[in-house]
Amino acid sequence: MKYVLTIVALAFLVFSAQPSEAVEALHTYDSMKEDTQELASQYPEIAVYSEHGISTGLDLEIFSVDVALNITELSDEELHALPTMYVDGTHHGNEGMSAEASFLFLQDVLQRSAADPSYLEGKRLVVTPSVNPDGYVLDCRSNWNGVDLNRNYPYMWGMYGTSD
């Protein structure tokens, strides 16, 4: 529980510490993917870009960035033992600002960590800007199959309040 509170406090401090530049336009899926790859490549000691699978309809990659101190030197066991904060965007594809917020959060953490490596000490961050790339591209709430990913997890699938 103390790790959760620490991470929540850290997230609050990151976003409240200083004003950021206004978002003039939302990323497209392609520009988000390209900018996320580019951002991770600027911080090779602490960030690793990876792709995890393909979306159900448009065959788009679901990608993320894993962030930790000396990430390329950590074993899988060491990496998975770190307290981890997971941030994602666009469970609802038509809520593009959630992808922007997760990307800007990643950018801010990487910049701060480069300036002060102790910022990440003993922590891990995983950011997936879009968990619903089909919905993001189509600007619709659900995925390609009409499933609202924010409501339909395995628990009580198909029960009251879920989508088909």
Protein language model regions, located:
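Secretory targeting signatures
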Residues: 1-22
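Intrinsically disordered low-complexity regions specifically enriched for long asparagine
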Residues: 14-18, 39, 136
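Short glycine- and acidic-rich boundary segments immediately preceding or forming the N-terminal edge
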Residues: 19-63
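Short, flexible coil/linker elements and helix-boundary hinge sites characteristic
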Residues: 44, 73, 116-117
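Short beta-strand-to-loop junctions in surface cap/lid or active-site-entrance loops
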Residues: 64-80, 90
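Active-site/substrate-binding loop(s) of hydrolase catalytic cores
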Residues: 78-91, 96-164
